[in-house]
């Protein structure tokens, strides 16, 4: 299962960028990061079995264990790609949200998209660590 982060805006050399790099390097699963301009830009084609997850403040509050279970189920079901979409400052419109398989929220607060990218990278590392029975995640 490819973990594909598609994000609006360039993270560049920043504290958030360093965090993203740190967690992506730790991941044992294949990862791709695609950066798009804040507006426009061509979204990568959706090929084969792909699940679209959009980060959105109206989305599902998903504990780390639930995210791990979802990724594990997709992997076991032969899903080829889990595509995690991070919008620009204004997020996604209703039509874009309707095309998502999952709307995922990191809480009801609004997060800067660069920080949301770092949080997503950490949660993906945590979820894959849970699936590998690695001691990184501590429940409770």
Indicate residue ranges for each PLM-predicted region.
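N-terminal beta1-alpha1 ligand-phosphate binding loop
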Residues: 1-24
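Short hydrophobic segments within beta-strands
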Residues: 6-8, 55, 85
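Short glycine-rich anion-binding loops that position phosphate/pyrophosphate groups of nucleotides
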Residues: 11, 57-60, 88-92
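Conserved strand-to-helix beginnings and helix N-cap segments that scaffold or border functional pockets
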Residues: 16-20, 64-68, 97, 117
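S-adenosyl-L-methionine/SAH cofactor-binding core of RNA-modifying enzymes
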Residues: 28-83
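Catalytic beta-strand/loop module used to bind and position nucleotide/cofactor moieties
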Residues: 66-95, 100-111
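Structured adenosyl-cofactor binding patch, chiefly the S-adenosyl-L-methionine
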Residues: 94-140
């Amino acid at each position: 299962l490819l973990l594909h982060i598609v994000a609006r805006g360039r993270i560049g050399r920043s504290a958030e960028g360093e965090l993203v790099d740190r967690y992506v390097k730790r991941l044992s699963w294949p990862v791709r990061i695609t950066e798009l301009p804040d507006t426009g830009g061509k979204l990568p084609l959706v090929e084969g079995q792909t699940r679209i997850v959009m980060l959105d403040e109206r989305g599902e509050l998903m504990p780390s264990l639930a995210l791990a279970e979802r990724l594990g189920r997709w992997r076991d079901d032969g899903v080829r790609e889990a595509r995690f979409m991070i919008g620009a400052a204004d997020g996604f419109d209703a039509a874009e949200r309707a095309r998502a398989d999952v709307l995922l929220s990191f809480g009801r607060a609004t997060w800067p998209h660069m920080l949301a990218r770092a949080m997503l990278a950490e949660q993906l590392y945590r979820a894959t660590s849970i699936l590998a029975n690695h001691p990184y995640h501590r429940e409770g």
